[in-house]
Amino acid sequence: MSIYVTFKGQVQKICISSGTILQELISTHYPNKNIIACAIDGIMADINTEINENQKIELYDFDSKEGQHVYWHSSAHILGNALVNLYQCKLVNGPALDEGFYYDIDIERPIREEDFADIEKEMQRIINKNIDFRKKMIKKDDLLKMYKDNDYKVHFINNIPDNLISVYYNDEFYDMCQGPHIQSTGLVKAFKILKSSSCYFLNSADNQILQRIYGISFPNKTLLKEYEEKVQKAKEMDHRKIGKELNLYFFHEYSPGSCFWLPDGVVIYNRLMEFLRKEYIKRGFKEVITPNIFHIDLWKESGHYQNYKENIYGISGEDFALKPMNCPGHCIIFKSVERSYKELPLRYADFGVLHRNECSGSLTGLTRVRRFQQDDAHIFTSKSSIKEEIENAIGFLKTVYSIFNFKYELFLSTRPTKFLGTIEEWDVAEKSLKDAIIDSGHTYTLNEGDGAFYGPKIDIILHDILNRKIQCATIQLDFQLPQRFDLKFKNELGMYETPVIIHRAILGSFERFIAILIESYGKHLPFWLHPRQVGLVTIDCKHENYMYTVEKSMLNVVLDLGIRKYTDPKDTLNKKIRKATLDGCKIICILGDKEMEKNEVNVRIGNKTRTYKIEELLEKIKVSIETKKEFIFN
């Protein structure tokens, strides 16, 4: 009998005998390929699974997402085993992450950094034993007896409908999980405990506080070293560190999660906003301003109160709340007058301030805040225009992200098990999204069944300079909200029709996007966006009047040009240049006798210099800002 095996895109037809174990096939046909995971007919499985005729087998090494997930899940089991051996704690949950793994435990004392060496030593002992991962199916009642002293595992078991539940053993250690796993603990060749923190069971503050221990592992030490170098680079580029050095913003205990933007930070914020405003005009968006406070009935009508109330800031003693999103306000605007098909698509953009009641433990610099603004837009359109509007949204996205040299990928999420509307409506909407993606020259990954109940969506995952994957943009179809607000427009036949809403954000929150920019560019933000575009450096005190002349000329051409002056007579020229460099000035203009005599400016970028006439320099600066291109020497 034969099967089809796929590895790294290459399909091979292989003849096998009855009862063949997949590991035997791998040893024979894929030696030295470091296969660590597999899928049989699209379902992830253990490598020691028996295979049958006509099955489709996919093999994965550590270079694949599937392989990494299995590898890190198995590493979490090794961590859990070590923690039980050391501390006799109660295990809760130990999943794989996009990068690494963690295990939550219930323990009487906190795990501190000084404990990491002991944990790593015990993990290494387990790894050195090269213990097999063995799967066993256990009856639910028997498993409840096995975990009778662990309320957390009992909770998970009781939420599993099946009577037979999979458990994985490593010698005497066992842990309930679906798997699959790598063959044995010895395949983990390099690992590190990263950090520990506290968390709540099931993420609810009403539940027990747990300890969460994070780790990372790799099949060789070279990959671990590369990871550590990447982490070190991320620390050096941390937006919290650079933001402080550039004096862009700060936070205060009197308003946790709400940023105090300083003048230079406001420059970046406003330039991003003005850039989008100009794009909105080109693309037919109408900017609106909606209230910050609404009666709670609005959030009940929209459905947000029922599903989102813990994140809504209410006003004590009043039936009002700060808005966490703009869409209900835009629905009120749409409904304020009778609408015709001639007005559609109607594109509302809103930079309004939003508040979300994030728990204090999750607040992280600019990436997780309570007060923020975003490039929020809602497009009210007919079903027939969905594809065109999605294409426009993707084109908008491409324009913006290309300016920042960001790579991205698209994920299409389709109809879930529970959904609003008809299957026919969903099929048409999903086809519109697929066609729009393809016609715009993009590819996509299908997340089948992962759409919201009110409509399919496109998630845009941005890759930053450290190749971290971050979601900022989203394009979401919504059949539900127009129905909740009873939105109507008159179609060509004079009949009332319900519009579709497209929720759309490109940058997402300005706070988070600025954090990404800082961590991608450091102090060297794009020239057009930078608050310190030009540093004026005088060689001597006698050149200060000329410096003010140059400054005035610059501001006459670009009113909001970010200029810093370095004139301290106690500083040498080299020290002034160094200060301007450390301040992040994109170009440094040195002014001395020669420049003053010839009405010129000596421009320095890094270690390169060039002399310009003032008029020539100003034109070059102006063009650089208008085109969003870097200022470079020709």
UniProtKB/Swiss-Prot annotation:
Pfam families: HGTP_anticodon, tRNA-synt_2b, tRNA_SAD. It is an enzyme of class 6 (ligase). Residues 1-61 form the TGS domain. It is found in: Cytoplasm. One of its GO terms (molecular function) is threonine-tRNA ligase activity. Gene3D superfamilies: Anticodon-binding domain (3.40.50.800), Bira Bifunctional Protein, Domain 2 (3.30.930.10), Threonyl-trna Synthetase, Chain A, domain 2 (3.30.980.10). It catalyses: tRNA(Thr) + L-threonine + ATP = L-threonyl-tRNA(Thr) + AMP + diphosphate + H(+). One of its GO terms (cellular component) is mitochondrion. GO terms for biological process: threonyl-tRNA aminoacylation. Belongs to the class-II aminoacyl-tRNA synthetase family. This is Probable threonine--tRNA ligase, cytoplasmic. It comes from Enterocytozoon bieneusi (strain H348) (Microsporidian parasite).
